[in-house]
Amino acid sequence: MSHVAEEDELGLDQQLAGLDLTSRDSQSGGSTASKGRYIPPHLRNREAAKAFYDKDGSRWSKDKDAYSSFGSRSDTRAKSSFFSDRGGSGSRGRFDERGRSDYESVGSRGGRSGFGKFERGGNSRWCDKADEDDWSKPLPPSERLEQELFSGGNTGINFEKYDDIPVEATGNNCPPHIESFSDVEMGEIIMGNIELTRYTRPTPVQKHAIPIIKEKRDLMACAQTGSGKTAAFLLPILSQIYTDGPGEALRAMKENGKYGRRKQYPISLVLAPTRELAVQIYEEARKFSYRSRVRPCVVYGGADIGQQIRDLERGCHLLVATPGRLVDMMERGKIGLDFCKYLVLDEADRMLDMGFEPQIRRIVEQDTMPPKGVRHTMMFSATFPKEIQMLARDFLDEYIFLAVGRVGSTSENITQKVVWVEEADKRSFLLDLLNATGKDSLILVFVETKKGADSLEDFLYHEGYACTSIHGDRSQRDREEALHQFRSGKSPILVATAVAARGLDISNVKHVINFDLPSDIEEYVHRIGRTGRVGNLGLATSFFNERNINITKDLLDLLVEAKQEVPSWLENMAFEHHYKGGSRGRSKSRFSGGFGARDYRQSSGASSSSFSSGRASNSRSGGGSHGSSRGFGGGSYGGFYNSDGYGGNYSSQGVDWWGN
């Protein structure tokens, strides 16, 4: 210990002597070469600094935890390595040995945690020499980032039964479905990331969508939320990008860089209706682009656009965006869609319901995006009524219509209870339910209005319950904090408005309570789908009274279809409402007629193929031969889908998020 202290002391004396004109000779061993040399104050530390940078021949340390992705500086320290000459022998720190910039791994966030301020730093993959490398080869792993991306997830307990979900594909020359991920060539990077996510085998939608997308066919897919839709399009798209490389987009990026370098040309674009859903898809993209040169980015409203622009400027190959913010970015000249090969519209019906059709048409038809037939387009949603399918004609070319499970139905994994509760008794009944539920269970309570959410949260708080709430008027930060409190169990009760029905990607919600029932059955389906996700068991309780008569028949049909207990009073009300209204009992929602489960092109003779993912007895034929009690009028599905439920082995993978 004393020896070290002496060395430190001596080293300090030597450094001080270097600044002392009178004692330089004695400290430098009597060297005459340095005698009397004057060093101006502003230059006195330059030699020491240079020695630090150059002592191992690489300026910044080669250690994997180097300080910043701006890494080194040139010999003259005039500019960062971002603008430095990529050739020559000059070092770029930890990026030197790898011939790339700050992407040790997925999601473009660098080699460490994936979100640190250093890892997000300056080097852009577009400006790197990565195009000279084979994009299909994985980059070195990052243990820290791997832990961050793949440590969570619960695959559920009832996956086996979901191999039997029936599927129908409509269109010409439908590619055969797969039974395992290894049945289709997706490359080393994708297969490695599938293993890291602990996905054992594809869900029904993935079994059929992956080979269709790999064959570069346009696709319209109807599948329930939580069924693995996100991976169904991300896996084949990323696989193709790894195989094909950046192509002309990289050349355009470099050419644009000569004049300021700020416009990005993504290869793939994913449009989502809400910011929460966009973030969810982005997080999945980070997983599947781990150890690749693909850099995913996300842009959405309600957040600092300046930060999003700075993130884009570091490079963007796969962009996830909400329509409004994307139009803003395009008008600012930050995004160009000239070389977009893959377009995905996720929750397409939701986007149209929210009024995004003008923005979507502006993006797809009125800008520089390649036309249909040149680009590859996919639409995913839980519902696709005929009206939306007709709109899809403008975006899709010779597409395959894929329906997996009964679109709009619920899973048998969810136990549904409907109880008659007068409006004045709802709060008292809710307290009884909460008291009967385990303290560690996550409970989601749906109400109809923002004011109702705040009021109910305040009531529960004063009753001594740890709770929080979300609705459309909350800021992005408040919503994220509420979700974090709920997920972590600090506030195991979450009160949410209807805008949250398609959100909340939380794998362990045990109980969904419809404090206020929605006005249409599709909203009900999406709400109770927050529990019983991907193979787990769940409970949904709904408070019913005279205000909810309009959905009586639909609710009855849904309960019967899912083999749930039906209260006798509900059957009587449905019977009375059916004849009193003089109708078939269907509510007048825009989705009436089968939840979009029928391909409208079948009326003009389009071909179809029917598959079963499991037992042969469940492989009913397509066409129109099977009617159903839901009054679908002999459509191509009718009774084609049974009520076997729907699941998968993916818990953190669903694409449905709460949002506005």
Curated annotation (Swiss-Prot):
The modification N6-acetyllysine is found at residues 55, 117. This is Putative ATP-dependent RNA helicase Pl10. It is an enzyme of class 3 (hydrolase). The modification Phosphotyrosine is found at residue 103. A motif (Q motif) lies at residues 179-207. It comes from Mus musculus (Mouse). Residues 413-574 form the Helicase C-terminal domain. The modification Phosphoserine is found at residues 80, 84, 89, 101, 182, 455, 592, 603, 610. Residues 210-402 form the Helicase ATP-binding domain. The modification N-acetylserine is found at residue 2. Residues 44-66, 93-103 have a biased composition (Basic and acidic residues). The keyword Phosphoprotein applies. Signal peptide: none annotated. Pfam families: DEAD, Helicase_C. There is a cross-link at residue 214 (Glycyl lysine isopeptide (Lys-Gly) (interchain with G-Cter in SUMO2)). Keywords: Acetylation, ATP-binding, Developmental protein, Differentiation, DNA-binding, Helicase, Hydrolase, Isopeptide bond, Methylation, Nucleotide-binding, Phosphoprotein, Repeat, RNA-binding, Spermatogenesis, Ubl conjugation.
